[in-house]
Amino acid sequence: MKLCGFEVGLDQPLFLIAGPCVIESMQLQLDTAGKLKEVTDKLGVNFIFKSSFDKANRTSGTAFRGPGMEEGLKVLAEVRKQIGVPVLTDVHEYTPMDEVASVVDVLQTPAFLVRQTDFIRKVCSAGKPVNIKKGQFLAPWDMKPVVEKAKATGNEQIMVCERGASFGYNNLVSDMRSLAVMRDTGCPVVFDATHSVQLPGGQGTSSGGQREHVPVLARAAVAVGISGLFAETHPDPSKALSDGPNAWPLDQMEALLETLMELDAVTKKHGFSRFA
């Protein structure tokens, strides 16, 4: 599949979707995107910047949700213009898709909305590539009908994303078998290495996280074989306005990516048919 001008798939190098969870300010987004571009250019990694203009599913009703669509799209447009990278953002049921699609390169559907048929069709009809996040409550094989709904719109640029499965209260686990199972959708598979270490609602009024396990799960996913890696990052996760506990520090992205790209090359060297 072609995405933002480059090919993605199990016969292609790992690509990266990364950025702060939520748009906090113009300068933070530009600085973060600039640093990520510097790192990915150095390592030869295809890169898409991500950040959200509205986090509609915060644990607390008083938590920071973002600047809103109008201001958020201005920021994403500036990142795209000044840094020269494609941009991704997530959308919601109330989002005017055409307006967002006129600014960003890739649309993303929140995991909690994966079963909303009309929503999936609406997003996939906007004429942009779509990254569909698998719900924490959904079996990997249940992504097949979701993809069928998506592709029924005529959009063939669909990716599926694993972000962990609910395991009791306030906890997620990553079943690495799901990455292989979701290949049966015929779509590129992306692994979300940071939301997978989230502890949803684990701090009472906010979610916790175990960012120390990001490299563990990222390495495991790359070893299984994935097309892309999704990772939220922040210059200072302790001060992030959303999902700080599971965000990977920006100054550690290069070291993590360097390891993952080496592992990706080894994993994909001989293909995957022998494991089918």
UniProtKB/Swiss-Prot annotation:
It holds the Pfam family DAHP_synth_1. It is an enzyme of class 2 (transferase). Pathway: Carbohydrate biosynthesis; 3-deoxy-D-manno-octulosonate biosynthesis; 3-deoxy-D-manno-octulosonate from D-ribulose 5-phosphate: step 2/3. Keywords: Cytoplasm, Lipopolysaccharide biosynthesis, Transferase. Its main location: cytoplasm. GO terms for biological process: keto-3-deoxy-D-manno-octulosonic acid biosynthetic process. It is found in: Cytoplasm. Gene3D superfamilies: Aldolase class I. GO terms for molecular function: 3-deoxy-8-phosphooctulonate synthase activity. It catalyses: D-arabinose 5-phosphate + phosphoenolpyruvate + H2O = 3-deoxy-alpha-D-manno-2-octulosonate-8-phosphate + phosphate. Its EC number is 2.5.1.55. It comes from the Bacteria. InterPro entries: Aldolase_TIM (IPR013785), DAHP1/KDSA (IPR006218), KDO8P_synthase (IPR006269). One of its GO terms (cellular component) is cytoplasm. HAMAP family: KDO8P_synth. Belongs to the KdsA family. NCBIfam families: KDO8P_synth, PRK05198.1. This is 2-dehydro-3-deoxyphosphooctonate aldolase. The gene is kdsA.
